[in-house]
């Protein structure tokens, strides 16, 4: 009965499901984040990162970025909700780690670009590093994931390329290579129509 967007948790014994509600209630509700914004849709786009010590963190948000530790059961918060101050944050936070660096990428402004920040700690402070990916074709939104596979890094995102005559909220999944500079910063993504081989 709480108005606004919420974040729930579903579980399954298999990656393809079936999934069931793990709690019987939302993990995050809009009334838990009203001190930062009065909008009702700020509690969206969750991502979970499990650090090297096994501690899990939930990051999420729209117009405001938040994180909280998760208990080992992964269905309860373990401490307060913390606000993360990022320039021009819109939504879709994603956390990954490479070496000693943590990377927090996110959708910025509208139409959305992907920006990122770096830190030596999963809890910050975060240093803004700029744009990672420009506006994707025929898509006002642009969300991302960054993964390592067999020693190479990949940038997964979406555009509206499959149906360019449709609306700007249609999403086509894309994947391109991601490269790092010697100082650990990420090189801007070169969006391709071919993807990866």
Tell me what each language-model feature is.
Residues 1-197:
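Carbohydrate-active catalytic/glycan-binding domains of CAZyme proteins
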